[in-house]
Amino acid sequence: MLTSSSHHGRSYDVFLSFRGEDTRKTFVGHLFNALIEKGIHTFMDDKELKRGKSISSELMKAIGESRFAVVVFSKNYASSTWCLEELVKILEIHEKFELIVVPVFYDVDPSTVRKQNGEYAVCFTKFEANLVDDRDKVLRWREALTKVANISGHDLRNTYNGDESKCIQQILKDIFDKFCFSISITNRDLVGIESQIKKLSSLLRMDLKGVRLVGIWGMGGVGKTTAARALFNRYYQNFESACFLEDVKEYLQHHTLLYLQKTLLSKLLKVEFVDCTDTEEMCVILKRRLCSKKVLVVLDDVNHNDQLDKLVGAEDWFGSGSRIVITTRDMKLLKNHDVHETYEIKVLEKDEAIELFNLHAFKRSSPEKEFKELLNLVVDYTGGLPLALKVLGSLLYKEDLDVWISTIDRLKDNPEGEIMATLKISFDGLRDYEKSIFLDIACFFRGYNQRDMTALFHASGFHPVLGVKTLVEKSLIFILEDKIQMHDLMQEMGRQIAVQESPMRRIYRPEDVKDACIGDMRKEAIEGLLLTEPEQFEEGELEYMYSAEALKKTRRLRILVKEYYNRGFDEPVAYLPNSLLWLEWRNYSSNSFPSNFEPSKLVYLTMKGSSIIELWNGAKRLAFLTTLDLSYCHKLIQTPDFRMITNLERLILSSCDALVEVHPSVGFLKNLILLNMDHCISLERLPAIIQSECLEVLDLNYCFNLKMFPEVERNMTHLKKLDLTSTGIRELPASIEHLSSLENLQMHSCNQLVSLPSSIWRFRNLKISECEKLGSLPEIHGNSNCTRELILKLVSIKELPTSIGNLTSLNFLEICNCKTISSLSSSIWGLTSLTTLKLLDCRKLKNLPGIPNAINHLSGHGLQLLLTLEQPTIYERLDLLRIIDMSWCSCISSLPHNIWMLKFLRILCISYCSRLEYLPENLGHLEHLEELLADGTGILRLPSSVARLNKLEVLSFRKKFAIGPKVQYSSSMLNLPDDVFGSLGSLGSVVKLNLSGNGFCNLPETMNQLFCLEYLDITFCQRLEALPELPPSIKELYVDEHLALRIMEDLVIKCKELNLIAVTKIEYQNFYRWLDSIWSDVSELLENSQKQQLDDMLQLIPFSYLSTAKREEVLKIVIHGTRIPEWFRWQDRSATTMSVNLPEYWYTENFLGFAICCSCCFYHSARSYDVEFEGSMHHYNYDSSYWKEYEEPSYDFYERDSIEITAKLTPRHKGMRTEELKKVCSFSMNVLRRATAVPNMCFAFFPFNSLCHISNLQANNPNDYGIFETCLSPGDIRHRGKQWGFNLVYKDETGGSVTHEMLINR
């Protein structure tokens, strides 16, 4: 038997698929005997099936445990559904890279199989007639035949002229060749690689005929070779020949390139080494011999251009359809060789990294409980690098906790040698200046801005453009959002190299700093110094470190970074080396720099939080300085003279409290890009003129005392952001019009601003808010096509400019909370580009003179005096209007009769228009209406014409808010007629229906005709005692508890799509009384919530029905409560993950699924609510002991999108070929908020089919899975009162359900 089979834990080498009546006693019989004679363990159904076994299950299992599948196509093969199902399974495993398919065309042409014509067409005609209800199955059969027929195989009639003996011998040869050829990959290696292979497959473009070269690149140990192996195994049988040359770089350490050329040719042509002594001559031979062959070649770990030139020189070396795959650490090699596509392999995501580590450290996908915390430390250390995960996982396999702890401590100082050696290979190939750049980044500058680094390296003479480019191409660093980054382990490697330098030039470790500054270390060699921890210094040592005597010895010091506070050290610094290029000194204690400090090549200077009063007297020539940061220097009273700092790009003076003015020369810095002076609260004056032509950002935020803005020169065309928030500026100069590129103008809380120049309309976006003294806006002279967006909030204007219509490009206008505005200019008609008009809470606005024709979105939220759109002619022109939002408009008592003319309206929101009591009868003419939102209105009846709204998807007539700000409650809902929604049944397009808080007794029987309905909310409908039959499309149901208990069983059975039931506890008639009592007597509410109503509800769920083959979705229930039922066998209060070893035979035919329950308290960020009831307001606070018990102040759940519960089954033993089964369900915050701010119980039932489809059970025994794990995320949930647990659910003798605990007791 071939050893490869047993090595991989496979039961068979070859699986034979054939039509018995055609070939069992002829071709297949002979092939089977030949395979057995050669020692190839072969599965043939009549030879291997054991008595009493299910034939189908046995076959499926045999396919999954085979290395090869030989499919013998004969005339009657397609007539057997058994054969076709077998073929589908073969293809499924083949596409997971785990099975090699060898098609044999016995007495049919390959095109007959591929196209299903001839004899196969007759079979499929019958199938399509007999399997009308299962067309998907027929399509799967067709697809499988087509795909397998496209694999290179053996055509007995045409290739072998009918000679069965020759054909069988060639099949044997191919199998032997491919056993030696195919590169093994364990399941552990494939973690996280599936998505990468999918992407690489798309880059190969197997559908194209030409030659295609694909490059795979990335840092060492990231998984390039693994990806290439998986890709090779997936596709090599589609080529005439294939060769995987592994580790070319290492291979050439022991052999010549000529030898490698000969190896490549020998493997591709299956010939002996050719007699040749010259690489150039060998190139000619390779091209001549391979130019007509379709080949797959993988060159792994290439590191030199010559290797590519001599092995895969050009496209014309290979035949049409050939594919060349190259893996390398150096992307530049791929560019130089003109590969068609490149793909970078990235490190693993956290969950994938944990899985890979577990498979090596524990030989399974889940860890042992006591190692979980340490596991995360190790995985975080690796940064998701597969090599590191494998090495450390194998190192810690079967070790105890003490060894783990010791290893983690050791890794901090001495990284694992094998990992570092692999990473260092790329570093060793660098030029000296490239090595210097890399070491500077690793020791000091990871995460720094690329522009700053370029300036530093240029001043250091390191050729930064070429150097940084090379480091990126070799995967040693990467650029992310203009910052230079590197992998954690790459930084460890770089720092390790820096420590081993002799003498040390870069000092970054605290233990080395002391020796460097006051010890015997050669100080004259030091180029970089990082000072981080003063605690290491004894009394007097810190003073010496900063003394002139010590610092004068650091003559070559380029980089000085001090990150800590001085902590009692107040002595002046007497000396700083003039060699400094980068000086970063936080909390510098001196008032100024030493007088002899002349750093002529200084590039970067930051002195955040220092005691500097002035940097130096007079002007200094600092021609290389690009960044000066003096932020939080609270004593700074004077800025330097900038006349000789001509290349300054960024000047940051943020929060310099004592600064009254800046040097006038700042206005003439031609290269200045950023000037940040925010929170300079004493600043009174800027230079009279600013002509910094490169300036892009000017931030004067919170400069309260700044009264005047300077004149702007014409060359100021690059400024994009100007922030004047909370300044004391009274007016802006007309010359501001020269800021032609301004995109972001912030004028928030400019309390002294009284006027704006007309040039303000030259800016694209204008947002003016809380400018209390601004009484008017300037007129627009002539048409202006600049301003696109205008937002006015809390300003004191009484009207818009009469010339507002001249803003011909304005497309967004929002006027919010402007309490004095009473009218809009009639020229608003002229806003021909206006698509959005929002008039929000402008309570004195009396009329809307017109609506521009282009309007798309019209909002009049909260308007009190607006005489609604009564003009009969305006609707004829509003063909583009899609959204009308008139919510909270208490003045509206009716909608215009002509609203029906808005035929393209999609959303109509009239919620909380309390005086609105009816809808127009012609509402049904809004034939494109998709959402009708009428919450909290006085509407008592839907017009019959709504039956015509055949595109309506959302219908909401909620009569109250869920608990939250401004809760509104109306007694009108108690007396609604039962036929208020009589037309519902005709709204077949409705997807979401909200009837919460209504007082009707019945819903129409036609509800079951809402075939698209997925969301139904009937909470707080106290008078509703029963439900009509609901449509089977329902997915989410929000319902009161009294109703849920009555309908649960019937609902689950009939609504096949149902996956969420959210249950509320509060009875409608007690709603107001409950609000009054919740804050004063919370303990009683809490006691009631713990009556275990969930237990009663769960007894009603037909779990047996949920576990049928047709139901694969998780059922979720949300209900009030704090304690989970006792029958949840495995429970926890602290951990967010639980893992248990299942009993040996936990799975039986009666097993239904896994039940998981979690109690959590989700609360609102508001601390009080206003409730309106029959005209009076009531205010409620909930700062009670109850909330203090359940709140976690450091965590607000509303910042999360959802809470997720995961169920996962893992194989019992290592080496099993079964993959883990996993299913995730989520409870969105929108659902959990509806539980009225009391503790929630989240219950999830995972039918076994949701983890493992019933068809998979034919190939896998569920009892092979011995570990069940469930986790609750987000994983940082840490609030008091949380409890959760799970159990296994089985079917009992009566058809009901029992838990595993109950089963054991029986």
Swiss-Prot record:
The lineage of its organism: Eukaryota, Viridiplantae, Streptophyta, Embryophyta, Tracheophyta. Residues 10-179 form the TIR domain. Disease resistance (R) protein that specifically recognizes the Xanthomonas and Pseudomonas effector proteins XopQ and HopQ1, and triggers cell death. An NAD(+) hydrolase (NADase): in response to activation, catalyzes cleavage of NAD(+) into ADP-D-ribose (ADPR) and nicotinamide; NAD(+) cleavage triggers a defense system that promotes cell death. Makes small amounts of 2' cyclic ADPR (2'cADPR). Its EC number is 3.2.2.-, 3.2.2.6. It comes from Nicotiana benthamiana. It catalyses: NAD(+) + H2O = ADP-D-ribose + nicotinamide + H(+); NAD(+) = 2'cADPR + nicotinamide + H(+). This is Disease resistance protein Roq1. Changing W82A: Loss of NAD(+) hydrolase activity. Homodimer.
